[in-house]
């Protein structure tokens, strides 16, 4: 008999967290599961720790070279036998009842995707300091369906005022992915989740969100990401939005096309902002000013960014 659910765990150099992660999957109240762990060429003790577990529900895939989370998740989907698949990052963990609760909602609502709230855990901390829906409790106080327009609009707004549903780790009907030839895009890490969920919605998926939190999401301290990494991620969001704008289902939907186009413009503006702020931090105001005045294109960009810079500055106070 095939398992109900396949839990897919890409793992790369997470020896500090992998035991808690894996045990949270093995100890689910829903026992009819399989766990597919993809060791992505870890150079620490991650694989050694995983291989200590004799549980027959655990399958290990070993990559000889590092491929990235999106590629590994696709390997997991290809190997999966479950009716449903669900991702778990190797530095995160599940509440014991997570799979059981999501599966029950999926059956009741005839859903293709079901996501829950997230507990946010700061790295090196033990207790949650917030949840994904903390900024929108009224909007997510009960189970609700999310359409593609709402999904993109919520992700477009600043995280301080809007939950980014691209961060969720939903239970996904495996047959829906296979029938629609959908998979993670490995080249846009770490936003491959956002793209996959958007494409599912464009294909007509029924995506349900529940207010309860059963997923513990570990994240770095605020502001720890480098400007280079921020710009890289923003470039990926630009590429993803341009790709979405090319889809027939977007072109035929004026409201959707408008909001994605607006999202693209906002991301491009954010990217330009960081291209100005980083030199200010590294070189100082005077040196950056002299460089800007000597470069007409950079001067144009800077002048264009002044209203946006002021808006960001006052919104943070």
Language-model features, listed with the residues they occupy:
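Acidic helix N-cap motif at the loop->helix transition within catalytic regions
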Residues: 17-19, 44-52, 93, 97
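A conserved acidic beta->alpha catalytic loop
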Residues: 24, 39-48, 65, 89
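C-terminal subregions of glycosyltransferases and related glycan-biosynthesis enzymes
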Residues: 195, 202, 209, 213-317
